[in-house]
Regions:
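Nucleotide/pyrophosphate-binding catalytic subdomain
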Residues: 1-130
Length: 130
């Protein structure tokens, strides 16, 4: 039997959590498909990536400089990539996303948290990104 496994935001909040996910997935060979949320809070004073993406969209909508919000989002994904030693060119994809921010709807912007997290998780697990 094949299993689909879903991990929420706190389960993918940082590289340490990614390692726990990998251990869980590898413990059961029937876990062939993994679905991830956007990274959640790393601690009580932290921000969820989804919340930051909503804030990024609000800045875009009201023509306010969003670069500081973007840097927080970008850094979180880069930190995960770096700590896990991944090769995924996530920086380039993130920068392209930010450059083209005005071409996206709110739903597209907010969905990038799951998208970028899934890209990193797929590489980390050695799975195909679908």
């Amino acid at each position: 039997m094949l299993k689909i496994t879903k991990f929420g935001g706190s389960s993918v909040a940082n590289a340490t959590q990614f390692k726990k996910v990998k251990a869980i997935v590898q413990a059961d060979p029937s876990r062939k498909y993994v679905v991830v949320s956007a990274p959640g809070k790393r601690n009580s004073s932290d921000n969820k990536i989804t919340d930051l993406l909503y804030l990024l969209d609000a800045h875009r909508q009201y023509h306010v400089d969003a670069s500081n919000v973007y840097r927080l989002i970008r850094q979180r994904f880069v930190d995960i990539k770096t700590e896990l030693g991944l090769k995924q060119p996530i920086e380039k994809e993130l920068d392209t996303f930010y450059t083209n921010l005005n071409t996206y709807t709110q739903a597209q912007i907010v969905s990038r948290g799951e998208y970028f997290c899934a890209k990193l998780m797929a590489e980390y697990l050695g799975y195909d990104f679908v």
